[in-house]
Amino acid sequence: VQIGSFSELEILANMVQKYQKPVHLTFNSLYYRPEQYEEIARIIQQCRSIGFESYILADPALLVYLRKEKIDCEVHLSGDLGTVNSAMTEVFAKEYPKRIIFQRKNTISEMRAVIQHITAQKEATRKEWTYPTEFEAFALNELCQFSGAFCNSLHCDEMGYLCRVPYWKKPVSLSESKLEKQEKNRPGENISISEWDSASELTNPVSEDGYLCGATGCGLCTLKQLSDAGITHLKLVGRGNYTDFMERDIRNLRRTLEILEDSSTEEEYIRAMKAELFPNGCSHMCYAR
């Protein structure tokens, strides 16, 4: 939600009190000018005065500035921060962030490695450092791994988004022959345009009003793996989406979590989830493989 004035924030604060739902304010620019930090700190203090204590930040220097000014608000490290790895957690540990939001480009194994590293460091009882206790991963919408810090594509009405062009990702250590065996016919990443058209002709998964859960990116099949890796929170992207589509996304994600809780195996979960949410097929815009 874009907030245009402080009076709108006050209205939102009253809604938070009424419905008892957490709201995090976002300062998601990749960097701010040093002369802006004082003003941002003042704005954050104003927001804290009406009950907003949690902030998502993408500018590392802003976090350092806030801690230097003794502003002890709750901080979530944004998925647009640039790089998320074990070494990065060491850099930020002294600034005591509460949550790390993993980027779209992070694989599940990379998330697991970072969380395991943090767990090991906590057990080492380095009292002067405070590591994150919450870990968030993308679950629905906006597949593009280059969003935010890594986006170099031209976005305009006249041209399609570069991230919507069929593509595939390749680990640099793999040879071409091994890659072909590992990546062959994996839809969403390396599917050809002709294959995509052929698949679309068989069934149309989009509803009559244009809605399809996870149409621009979906990680629902991986929720069991994310949970096992240590992910505690899921991110559902709503920016630019229709309000009613966003509401349906939320309901579908909640239902998916219920199905996951009732399933004894990952295979059973995926089968039941797809049967209920995607009876005519899904978007094939998968976050992870």
Task: Enumerate the language-model features and the residues they cover.
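Active-site pocket-lining/capping segments in soluble small-molecule metabolic enzymes
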Residues: 1-87, 101, 106-289
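As written
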Residues: 96-97
